[in-house]
């Protein structure tokens, strides 16, 4: 065996160990979003906060997708910029506070203007376009998930702005 062949062989073993460690870490991270085999498998995407027109209140929007075989429930949201974050549903000119919202199995729950939203009462700092808000979503069955929501311009709509 040549010196070059030996060198590749010895560096191959540590590389294989490192790959195994990285793969096992990734598996743990993905399982943290589920309640186990046959349970919900949640993913959050598209989180954003439109720059508020008033310094007293802001709203957060996102989508939760459950690719698992069981439903779950969103039971609460906290935000790093507000002592009080409340889930609401707007419909027919009214708004009502909700304590939990179902996330259907093999379905999605969308928070968007005119429907579900998280009301961020009295932000502790002024929110400007380009800032970020950390949201932590709590579920009945699945582990809590933290997402980073960028502050977008007033009137921002993901389907038309990107």
Where are the model-predicted features located?
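C-terminal motif of bacterial Sec signal peptides marking the signal peptidase cleavage site
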Residues: 29-32
